[in-house]
């Protein structure tokens, strides 16, 4: 398969921009698809560091400075507007560069609502991947990062009949970015933008009521959202956390607390914490009912009483259950298989009979299986060994791409295990 990935006009596609979930989606999906042997063109900033076939330059620091001036995005929030100079220039340049490289049947991945580029290339298969905003969609095919955001967007659009070729595929994470640690420190952690809707005041209240140490990390100004108040003695505000600091904070925390007020589209920090073996405490709406296994990988709460109990009893959650859950369901190795199934479905629409295309060689429809910690063998870590799963688009015998081995892949083969689907069909048997 061939992909044209349009990055964000206002950021640089590197790991350094870890505070922007959308930038990280571009970075990782390009790598995931490229490792599987697909052709991937990345369109974005010339300083981007992306694993792909070609990095196509359509923006640079000079353009960003002209559009936004000089500001510290690590301290303040990202500046962006679809009508600004950076976005409009990105669109114009991307339209030209995509035109130089496209072939019939290619996919155009619009991560940031790049409708003008899609409109200029109607012969490409336009997809909005990883939708995580409550805005109307424009592409004929859409991937939502949670059922929560999909249903909310359908409601906004007054769409009572969902599209067969829209789907939900969760966000994906690189396990090598996180350190699994069973021995935890003495602090609770809040990680995210310092805005009212993220529930910063609730986190501080929990710390005050329990006397536990709390570390707050993220973009924004603490005092501006807390009425000018200084943090309590047991609360430390450390500002933006880069890749290394993020890794250390997540690995050492007793728990990550994310009591968001609003309908969280995904909440990636929850998965990052679980990959570090750290349990989570969240509100009970948005994507959290999909990502937090209550009582197993953390707790979901509705009242301050719930939050206090969860904080005091968080040590009952096993780090290994958190890690296994995140690795089995949200690692890059796992999620790329979901994307490949989705893109193969779209190829059927483009080249075949669409909904009625029957694949006689199909052996499973496991792409939507969700693996539960309670089903894991006690002494084994569960991952998806990507190197052993061929791409549906690759000819027989073709290599799957340059996949570096990891500790997880070098484990002994997994035994048969019981897994649950998403809860609608009960338990099913699957051989790993």
Language model segments and positions:
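Acidic, proline-/serine-/threonine-rich low-complexity intrinsically disordered repeat tracts
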Residues: 387-421
């Amino acid at each position: 398969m061939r992909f044209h990935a349009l990055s964000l006009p206002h950021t640089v596609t590197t790991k350094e921009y870890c505070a922007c979930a959308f930038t990280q989606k571009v970075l990782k999906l390009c790598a995931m698809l490229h490792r599987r042997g697909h052709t991937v063109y990345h369109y974005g900033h010339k300083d981007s560091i992306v694993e792909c076939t070609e990095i196509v330059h359509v923006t640079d620091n000079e353009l960003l400075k002209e559009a936004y001036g000089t500001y510290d995005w690590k301290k303040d929030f990202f500046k962006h507007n679809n009508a600004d100079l950076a976005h409009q220039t990105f669109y114009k340049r991307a339209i030209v560069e995509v035109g130089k490289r496209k072939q019939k049947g290619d996919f155009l991945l619009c991560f940031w609502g790049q409708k003008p580029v899609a409109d200029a290339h109607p012969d490409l298969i336009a997809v909005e991947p990883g939708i995580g905003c409550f805005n109307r969609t424009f592409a004929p095919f859409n991937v939502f990062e949670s059922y929560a955001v999909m249903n909310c967007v359908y409601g906004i659009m007054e769409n009572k009949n969902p599209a067969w070729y829209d789907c939900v595929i969760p966000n994906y994470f690189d396990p090598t970015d996180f350190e699994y640690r069973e021995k935890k420190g003495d602090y609770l952690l809040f990680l995210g933008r310092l805005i009212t809707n993220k529930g910063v005041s609730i986190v501080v209240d929990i710390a005050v009521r329990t006397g536990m140490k709390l570390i707050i990390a993220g973009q924004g100004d603490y005092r501006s959202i807390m009425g000018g108040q200084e943090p309590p003695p047991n609360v430390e505000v450390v500002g933006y956390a880069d890749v290394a600091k993020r890794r250390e904070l997540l690995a050492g925390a007793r728990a990550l607390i994310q009591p968001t007020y609003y309908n969280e589209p995904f909440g990636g920090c929850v998965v990052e914490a679980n990959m570090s073996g750290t349990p989570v405490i969240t509100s009970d709406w948005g994507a959290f009912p999909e990502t937090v296994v209550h009582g197993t990988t953390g707790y979901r709460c509705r009242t301050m009483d719930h939050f206090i109990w969860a904080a005091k009893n968080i040590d009952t959650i096993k780090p290994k259950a958190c890690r296994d859950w995140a690795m089995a369901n949200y690692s890059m190795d796992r999620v790329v298989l979901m994307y490949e199934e989705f893109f193969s479905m779209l190829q059927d629409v483009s080249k075949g009979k669409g909904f009625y295309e029957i694949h006689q060689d199909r052996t499973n429809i496991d792409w939507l299986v969700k693996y539960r910690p309670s089903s894991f063998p006690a002494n084994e870590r569960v991952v998806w060994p990507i190197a052993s799963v061929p791409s549906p688009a690759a000819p027989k015998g073709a290599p799957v791409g340059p996949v570096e081995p990891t500790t997880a892949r070098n484990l002994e083969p997994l035994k048969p295990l019981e897994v649950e689907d998403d809860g609608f069909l009960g338990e099913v048997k699957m051989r790993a």
